[in-house]
Amino acid sequence: MNIQALMQQAQTMQKKVEANVENAKKDLANKEVHAEAGSGLVKVTMTGRHVVKRLTIDPSLLEDEPDMIEDLIAAAINDAVRQADELYETTMAGATSGMGLPPGMQGMF
């Protein structure tokens, strides 16, 4: 195999990876994760791209101390971020699978 053919093969692979990654990013924007804190008193819905779509606070919490509400909101959002990160890793691994990329390179996207 000559160098020109090798370069063309690398270019083709790069375009395919870029297209797959772009499709995966669009897919992540449409997927949602759901998290909660305080046994469901605070609920968060977030996209796979870390956009908070909904935040629900049980009315009973509004009578309590603001510190408790703030802690539960932070916990729910942090859980949603963790789930969105896992969704991202899984989706990107799928987008670049079968491409023969070296280990660790999938996480670069």
Curated annotation (Swiss-Prot):
Gene Ontology CC annotations of this record: bacterial nucleoid; cytosol
One example GO MF annotation: DNA binding
Keyword DNA-binding: yes
Keyword terms of this UniProt record: Cytoplasm, DNA-binding
Record flagged with keyword DNA-binding: yes
Signal peptide: none
Alphabetical list of SUPFAM superfamilies matching this protein: YbaB-like (SSF82607)
Location(s), subcellular: Cytoplasm, Nucleoid
NCBIfam families the UniProt entry points to: DNA_YbaB_EbfC
The family this protein is said to belong to: Belongs to the YbaB/EbfC family.
Subunit structure: Homodimer.
UniProt function note: Binds to DNA and alters its conformation. May be involved in regulation of gene expression, nucleoid organization and DNA protection.
The name this protein goes by in its record: Nucleoid-associated protein Psyc_0793
Source organism of this protein record: Psychrobacter arcticus (strain DSM 17307 / VKM B-2377 / 273-4)
